[in-house]
UniProtKB/Swiss-Prot annotation:
The name this protein goes by in its record: Malonyl-S-ACP:biotin-protein carboxyltransferase MADC
Stated role: Gamma subunit of the biotin-dependent malonate decarboxylase multienzyme complex (EC 7.2.4.4). The two subunits MADC and MADD are required for the transfer of the malonate carboxy group from the acyl-carrier protein (ACP) to the prosthetic group of the biotin carrier MADF. Required for the regeneration of ACP.
GO BP term, pick one: fatty acid biosynthetic process
Locations listed in the record: Cytoplasm
Length: 318
């Protein structure tokens, strides 16, 4: 692996799960849990004649950003599409639980715990969701992760990073939506049903998964930023994701809580208004939504640089 300083300028899109995990925290602070040398792999895959990975396609560990303990979860899309099975799911669950337990321990020792020391969880998503090979074990893992995220609400901030090749789809799309903050790059993709699955089930006339422009207009970072599914857009480098994460974590927990998409009656009302808008607007393309948000020439936003886009793009208000 490259040195930490070299990792900072590496493309987030191209980086491996381990590179993202190491690079997002301060230099030399990352300690991995259940790494490859521990050889904890899926018990289901060998029974089906499938290849295994000794980390089950997920890197988990802890590091620091300043004085703040950062529990990191990073998915590897190069292994079965970053899918979540029994072992990788258990690693996610336990890592979040460790962050929660540490927070409780720190507060018991120091009730007025400074914000700069509050533990946080950072999840770098690269996944198509549940690992179909492991069926209910993978589904159960999703439920247990969601349970831990809810347990952390108002106590331990959980930040999603989405900018890797596979994107974040399937059940993990629900998981990302349940976290406090979502940071994406323009190359990140977020959704529930992936483009290929939509085409397979509904036909190419309904959604052409080979049309990359269409895919990014529908699930990409710029679209998600305009409609409010994504809180922040970062450049395509580990450094940019790290800097954006650091900036978010400098905010008090009460403010971070306001960035959520779900979890309160107010948020439910906002979502209902968006559903009403989609019914009345009847958009044929994301460009219709961008225009409704106040972007007079929405097509011009597509090829803008990140800085230009952030300066000019108007976001949707329900």
């Amino acid at each position: 692996m490259a040195k930490w300083t070299e990792l900072q300028d590496k493309s987030f899109l191209e980086a491996t799960a381990r590179e993202r995990a190491v690079g997002i925290v301060d230099e030399g602070t990352f300690t991995e849990f259940c790494g490859p040398f521990d050889k904890i792999y899926s018990p289901h895959l060998p029974l089906m004649g499938e290849a295994i990975e000794y980390d089950d396609g997920l890197v988990a560990g802890v590091g620091k950003i300043g004085k703040k303990p950062i529990f990191v979860i990073s998915q590897e899309g190069r292994f079965i599409g970053g899918s979540i099975g029994e072992v990788s799911g258990a690693k996610m669950v336990k890592t979040i639980q460790l962050a929660s337990d540490l927070y409780e321990e720190m507060v018991s020792e120091k009730p007025d715990l400074p914000e700069e020391m509050r533990p946080a969880v950072v999840i770098s998503f690269e996944t198509g969701g549940v690992r179909l090979h492991e069926a209910n074990a993978g589904l159960l893992a999703h439920a247990e992760v969601m349970d831990q995220i809810q347990n952390c609400r108002g106590r331990v901030p959980i930040i999603s990073l989405i900018g890797s090749r596979v994107g974040c789809f399937g059940g993990m799309g629900f998981v990302a939506a349940a976290t406090d903050v979502i940071i994406m790059s323009q190359f990140g993709r977020l959704g529930l049903t992936g483009p290929e699955v939509i085409e397979q089930e509904m036909g190419k006339d309904e959604f052409d998964a080979s049309d990359r422009a269409l895919v990014y207009r529908t699930t990409g970072g710029k679209h998600k930023y305009i409609i409010g599914d994504c809180n922040y857009l970062a450049a395509d480098s580990i450094r940019s994701f790290r800097e954006t994460t650091t900036a978010v974590l400098q905010k008090p927990m009460e403010e971070i809580e306001t960035f959520r998409r779900i979890g309160s009656m107010e948020k439910i009302k906002e979502q209902i208004e968006l559903v009403k808008l989609s019914v009345s607007l009847k958009p044929k393309d994301s460009m219709d939504v961008w225009a409704h948000a106040g972007n007079e020439n929405p097509e011009s936003l597509i090829n803008m640089t990140l800085d230009e886009f952030l300066a000019q793009a108007k976001r949707l208000k329900a």
